[in-house]
């Protein structure tokens, strides 16, 4: 199979993955009661907890009623993930949020090759907002299909100053805070505020990168910057996935299937609780989004790689590593390998 045939197949797969996300996430959420459970919690103003008193929902997060509708819905839906009472959901929540930041970073690096820093961070800020408010599994395949079709074969890594520290402050610090037990360590109200702050995380990253680039301009060594960014992305993607995988293996009442494998839509007639609905939503979301990012990385690698690819070896290698360290981590490795190859090609041309 030629590179171009594989790339065309992957483009078609992006469309299928987005439709699959609608079928497995959006339609069941509407028809099988997940959104209804969210509405019921908003009406009562309480976030349920099986042990101890229910947490009271903050009535207004932004002061703008239209915005509060979206924020309250997201806080409510993520409550089973962050309240610590559902181990499977809590374990899956970490790599699911982490992979969103990793996919943002890889897409940003690819777009940055041919566009200005302001342009790519602004565009991806809106993509991030759509992913957070709807579903990463629905939005990411659509964006990858459009971005890949409109992009051209490129060469050369272009540094993005301050992006790693921006992601740490806007995404991963909040992720660590909501993972703390409540109300013993962190109050329920503060945990809700942190989730609300993280809703427009991609917009905060845009603001931080833009302001830092003008207030603290620095000369970045290309080789060091490339290594730092890819190591950061790889560590985030691999450690969060491996941590959840190992924890599920060591947990007495859980297994990897309980954490990562979503239920088939036709086997579920109705979600009996908010927790069940969120589990199905998040499992499908993480699975489809991770596969999308992996396929996008394969397509970019094959498009820009001039070397001959041994399909059997390549397929076995990437699939085996993806199972162990996650498809998102494998995507990082592929784009990193491609960048190293392009760098060597550029040096050879100069010589």
UniProtKB/Swiss-Prot annotation:
Documented EC number(s): 5.4.99.-
Disulfide bonds: none
Chain segments annotated as transmembrane: 7-27, 62-82, 89-109, 126-146, 160-180, 193-213, 229-249, 281-301, 316-336
Keywords tagged on the record: Isomerase, Membrane, Transmembrane, Transmembrane helix
Membrane topology: Multi-pass membrane protein
Localization per record: Membrane
Pathway(s) served: Secondary metabolite biosynthesis
Gene Ontology CC: membrane
GO molecular function terms noted in the UniProt entry: isomerase activity
Chief site of localization: membrane
Domain of life: Eukaryota
Family classification: Belongs to the membrane-bound ascI terpene cyclase family.
Chain's role: Epoxide hydrolase; part of the gene cluster that mediates the biosynthesis of the polyenes aspernidgulenes. The carbon backbone of aspernidgulenes is synthesized by the HR-PKS sdgA, which accepts acetyl-CoA as the starter unit and performs malonyl-CoA extensions as well as regioselective methylation and reduction. The resulting nonaketide offloads the HR-PKS by intramolecular lactonization to yield the 5,6-dihydro-alpha-pyrone-containing hexaenoic acids preaspernidgulene A1 and A2. The FAD-dependent monooxygenase sdgC then installs the first epoxide on the penultimate double bond.
Name assigned to this protein: Terpene cyclase sdgD
Highest classification ranks of the organism: Eukaryota, Fungi, Dikarya, Ascomycota, Pezizomycotina
